[in-house]
Amino acid sequence: MVGFCLAGCTAGSASAFAQSSVTLYGIGDVFLGSVKAPGAHTAIVQQGGGMTTSFWGLSGKEDLGDGYSSFFVLESYFQPNNGTFGRFSGDGFFSRNAYVGLASPFGSVRAGLLTTPLYIATISFNAFTNSYTFSPWIYHTYKGLGPQGVIGDSVWQNAVAYTSPTWGGLNGTAIYSFGNSSTVPGAHKWGVQLSYSNGPFAASANYQYINYVSTAGDIGTAVAALPGLQKESTTQLDASYDFHVVKVFAGYMNIRDKVTFGTASTNSEQVSFAIPFKTASILAELAYSNSSGSESNNAQRLTWAVGYDYLLSKRTDLYTAFKYDHFAGESTGLTYGVGMRTRF
């Protein structure tokens, strides 16, 4: 992480109202292994994002005095295996975060492209954190199969969010995403989160709502198994406890989809743990999802993963992991490999 002072805020400038700084930071992650999704063929790959999707970012803050400050964040994903930006073809340049904000003693407000509170809770309360290659909780939340999984991305465009101060370990966040067009009056998303942390215990409660874009049923194109999807609501409860010899995570999620001719409801649970050693951690995680309702096909999915993460230094680690992923009616998915991650 590299910090530097903006040219106009040197200590010798008598007219400077407040100190400002900009920080450059990021993570590079490369992975070599075998990847097979349920129902798909096996591919031997060298790619990015085994444990963390690679990204770089710039953040800045200006102290305005009396407990107030302004800030900004710009973050861009990249693929270290081929040098392209984004997570996939067509992804935006600053697709991780892009916002400005104001912090005060009464909380903070941000506006722009924002990471959702649901995503932050999902990666905070599972042993494999934000791994889009190995984390079962990520897969059951954001990489659903059939009628399962959350609609949309882990970031929302045209969004505004408020985060409260922390009182006794408790704080809250509310987020709203605008349709930004007079021709799509139905387009909006919103979510709320309550978080609590006290010593070794932490917990989070999330609710997220996504409405149709312009006419009822048009977001169904996002999920082929749910034609005519009109709206979706997601409730997620997570908790963790650090026993020092092992950190345990648990989560429950309900996703309820309203479609033109019926409903689909998916209940998901996960349990995972991380066993720390002096320079390493053993990771294990299990997630299960079961769908019901007239449009659900009673789909079921079971995913588990184990991994070993070894620290070379405070910034760099090596890892190896294996994931088993079974979705009803499809051949089992198996993914395994080794990787390296470094922070700057």
Feature locations, PLM:
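Cleavable N-terminal export/targeting peptides
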Residues: M1-S21
